[in-house]
Design a protein with these regions (language model features):
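Active-site phosphate/pyrophosphate- and oxyanion-stabilizing loops and adjacent acidic/basic residues
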Residues: 4, 28, 99, 129
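Short hydrophobic "strand-cap" motifs at the C-terminus of beta-strands
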Residues: 3, 33, 45-46, 71, ...
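Conserved AMP-binding A3 loop
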Residues: 1-25
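Gly/Ser/Thr-rich phosphate-binding loop
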Residues: 63, 85-93, 102-169
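Alpha-helix capping/helix-boundary segments
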Residues: 75, 97-98, 124
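Short beta-strand->loop structural element characteristic of the AMP-binding/adenylate-forming
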Residues: 14-17, 44-45, 66-73, 140
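Conserved AMP-binding/adenylation subdomain of ANL enzymes
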Residues: 24-41, 49-89, 104
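Conserved S/T- and glycine-rich ATP-binding loop of Class I adenylate-forming
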Residues: 6-9, 42, 48, 83, ...
Length: 169
């Protein structure tokens, strides 16, 4: 049995029970969902007590026989040096991590890395486009529930809904 701490999206963070069988099944199925194979180097800057790091990176990488590169903590300053050091091809993120990375000063060699794709939550449409342009890495946004059985993922070719509302009188 594994206790995962939820993000607290709907209230206070809480411990959710996850069986070893569920984690193993998620690892096997998420290899295809996140396009993780044996040749990938999966960079994990997020804490392993969170479902994103465990279910979208660690378990699929383990199932695929890929390499996992861990860091002590997320650092926007250390992100690109770590990615280059490990020759990372995939990573996961949560919250505002992408905007923090994009907030670092640009360099002409930002795209000089091995990253191909990443999975996470809460990056704005503008940040998704900027990250691809700057680093050459496609971000896939999704939402899952640590204690639930489902995952919502945006199709790679889907258009995002506009986040504005106009009222008429």
């Amino acid at each position: 049995m594994l206790l995962l701490l939820t993000s607290g999206t709907t209230g206070a963070s809480k411990a959710a029970i996850c069986s070893q069988g569920r984690l193993a099944a998620l690892g096997a199925s998420n290899c295809a969902k996140y396009d993780i194979g044996r040749a990938d180097v999966c960079y994990c800057p997020m804490p392993l007590f969170h479902g994103n790091a465990l279910m979208a990176l660690w378990a699929p990488a383990l199932s695929a026989g890929a390499t996992i590169a861990l860091t002590e903590r997320f650092s926007a300053t250390g992100f690109l040096p770590d990615v280059r050091h490990f020759a990372a091809t995939y990573f996961t993120y949560v919250g505002k991590a992408i905007s923090y990375i994009l907030g670092r000063p640009e360099s002409a060699d930002d795209a000089d890395n091995h990253l191909t794709h990443a999975f996470g939550t809460e990056a704005s449409p503008e940040d998704v486009a900027a990250f691809l342009h700057r680093f050459g890495c496609r971000l896939v946004e999704g939402y899952g529930s640590s204690e639930g059985g489902g995952l919502l993922r945006q199709a790679p070719d889907a258009r995002r809904a506009r986040s504005e509302c106009r009222a008429r009188a």
